[in-house]
Amino acid sequence: CLSKYDDALDAEGVDDNPGKQRLEKAIAGKYTAEIFGRIVGREACLALPDAWAFDPEAGSRTHAGHVTQLRRYHGVMADVATALIDRCADLTAAALAGVIKSQDLSTPHTVGILAEGTLFWQTEGYRERVEGTLNRLTPSHVQVRILQNASDVDANFIGAACAALL
């Protein structure tokens, strides 16, 4: 499901390990605005009214928030923004479903996934889409819940601690 836009982003991102971490580049908020700009064109992003305009090539000064707000715009820009955010959610769900299915859970289970990031917690409908898609992709006896890290502890440390307990 990766596109020529993903390929270009990967090839031109010399500091971002070309050829590696392809899924992360397709789903992470860090890259969303740049992919959007590659789809609609930099000029189209810059030509938007001031409240909506952004430079998709501005590196760390641009982010998924620029794209998520465009879902409320109109026309093709809103359609592309919606499709891109939905694709991020669906690819995230597919990757997580693969991990869950690899566990070969044969009895009823509730699986909790600790998620962090602005797409999950600041993008309307994103978490729900990931959760819904995950539940469709996993066996019916497995219920998946996306959990928010409400502590000040980095989610990676929490995950490492949980893995160490297994």
Predicted regions and their residues:
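ATP-binding/phosphotransfer module of carbohydrate and carboxylate kinases, centering on a glycine-rich
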Residues: 4-166
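Small-residue (GG/TT-enriched) beta-loop-alpha framework at ligand/catalytic clefts
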Residues: 1
